[in-house]
Every structure is written in C-alpha cells, then in structure tokens.
Amino acid sequence: RDTDRSRGLGDVYKRQLEKYGIGEVLNLRNRHSDDDEAKGTSIKLHRVKTKAHSISEKQLIQALRIIKNRKAPIVFHCHHGSDRTGAVCAFYRIIFQNVSKEDAIHEMTEGGYGFHRIYKNIIRRIKEANVEQIRKEVMEGGEL
C-alpha cells in the first residue's frame, strides 16, 4: 500500500512506520506537530492544519496534493483517525479510486473507524463536492 490512515503518531507508531517503509507522514491536526515523534528518523513530515467541525475544500485539496506528490509511501492522521482522517480518506477514494460519494461516506461512517456523527459537516462536504472540479485542482496542483 502506498497510502494509509492512522491515529496520532507515538513511539510505537513511529517504529512501525519505519518497519513498513513509510517515508512520509501527513498530519491533519491543528495543534500538535509530529516533530518530536519523527526526531531521529528520515520520515518527511507534511502538515495541513484542520478542525473536524470546519474542514474546508481548500484544506482537502491541499492534503490530496500532498498525497498525490509523495515520493514514498505515506500515512495520514489526525488525533483519533476518524473524522478529519476519514474526510481525507473519503476524498482520496473518490478522487483517485473513483469510489462513489455514497460508498465513501458509508466507508467513513460505518467502516469501523469511529466516525463521530456530530460532524455532519463532513458528510455534507462530501455530498456537495464538485468531484470533477476538485479532481482538476488536485491533479493540476504541483508540489506544495
């Protein structure tokens, strides 16, 4: 797998990332960087600061561009690995794997990742997304 999702990083996760050849990490948390956890590794860090209650299309496009332009297998995460990570994963599946919005929403909410139903805004963002426009912006976007 070239992409994967996760909860926040810790020492155990860091060792596992190195063990499985993960070379890049995309952090979706607003408050905490991965600098301390990645210290002493060759893992390349990326960050798009997001909040689950207000994740924007611009932030999603930025995250998807990072994933598209990665040079090594990447894992993306927030704190719980369910809401912000779920949104990025859903859009990844829609944009890169041509999964339907309905299937991506079902996977995000019923896939066992702990989606918090209070974040109806994420479901609405997916339902209302102009997939072709987002795909165009992601694909035309160079490295960030």
Predicted regions and their residues:
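Single conserved hydrophobic/aromatic residue that forms the stacking wall/gate
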Residues: R1-Y13
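Conserved strand-to-helix beginnings and helix N-cap segments that scaffold or border functional pockets
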Residues: E57-L60, G86, Y119
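Cysteine-based protein phosphatase catalytic domain of the PTP/DSP
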Residues: D11-A72
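A phosphate-binding catalytic loop at a beta-strand-loop-alpha-helix junction
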Residues: K71-A90
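Second-shell loop/turn segments in exported
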Residues: R7, I22, K49-H53, H79, ...
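PTP/DSP superfamily signal
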Residues: H53, L64-A72, F91-L144
